[in-house]
């Protein structure tokens, strides 16, 4: 079985209303690792999802959404805390900006006691804000380290400065989880935040020095690159398409 673990929230898109004092809200199940889990399941892989999931109505619907997409919910740890929310605004190019409501919420409360036996998994994917918000961050780092000898560990930082604006926290997390992971995936935006004075190739090489076998870098409309521990380098151009929004694009790449 494959496992993704971490965020469990709703992406909330505010819309216009006929009244200036009202807005419409369109909420969609989200969370970067959760999107990865659904992507893997849609590719035909037996997949589970690990998170602390709220017992509230949003958490119940989130679990049903996972089930309807073929993702096992046996690793969802029930929580009395609320479901996290992300308010999303899209610019003219379809790129999102985020405002998160996470404090005291279920997904970031995951504890070691709620984690399954790691030896049952072939591969484990983790990343995003759940790796920097405590106590979940420490839990996932511990879990990945426990699993690294029996499962492939894939890590995507998926930087969210609006949640944790301190660059040093993200850098320390990348160093810690990069030393555990067998595969890393970053976006060009992640690299620009983590190392603004480095090129993509320079930063990818610094990540390889942490220990992963492969480092993948996505660049939106510019395509993607992969760097290998033995000096390999490949690049793939992106097809030309009409973009409505880019939410979840990197997660889809990670799942594949």
PLM feature segments, named:
Residues 1-3, 21, 146, 196-256:
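Conserved phosphate-binding/catalytic region of the ribokinase-like
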Residues 1-3, 122-123, 183:
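Structural motif
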Residues 129-206, 222-223:
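Conserved beta-alpha-beta core of the PfkB/ribokinase-like small-molecule kinase fold
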């Amino acid at each position: 079985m494959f496992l993704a673990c971490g965020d469990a929230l709703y992406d909330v898109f505010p819309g216009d209303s006929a009244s200036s004092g009202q807005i419409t809200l369109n909420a969609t199940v989200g969370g970067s690792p959760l999107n990865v889990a659904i992507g893997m399941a849609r590719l035909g892989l037996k997949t589970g999802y690990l998170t602390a999931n709220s017992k509230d109505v949003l958490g119940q619907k989130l679990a049903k959404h996972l089930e309807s997409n073929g993702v096992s919910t046996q690793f969802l740890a029930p929580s009395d805390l609320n479901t996290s929310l992300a308010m999303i605004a899209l610019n003219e190019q379809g790129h999102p900006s985020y405002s998160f409501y996470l404090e005291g919420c279920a997904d970031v409360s995951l504890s070691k006691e709620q984690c399954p036996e790691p030896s049952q998994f072939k591969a484990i994917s983790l990343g995003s804000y759940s790796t920097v918000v405590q106590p979940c961050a420490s839990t996932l780092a511990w879990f990945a380290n426990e699993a690294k000898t029996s499962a492939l560990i894939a890590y995507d930082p998926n930087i969210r400065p609006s949640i944790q604006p301190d660059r040093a926290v993200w850098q320390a997390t990348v160093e810690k989880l990069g030393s555990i992971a067998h595969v890393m995936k970053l976006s060009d935006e992640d690299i620009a935040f983590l190392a603004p004075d480095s090129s993509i190739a320079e930063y990818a090489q610094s990540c390889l020095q942490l220990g992963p076998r492969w480092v993948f870098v996505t660049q939106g409309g510019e395509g993607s690159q992969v760097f290998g521990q033995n000096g390999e380098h490949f690049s793939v151009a992106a097809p030309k398409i009409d973009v409505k929004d880019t939410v979840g694009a990197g997660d889809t790449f990670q799942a594949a």
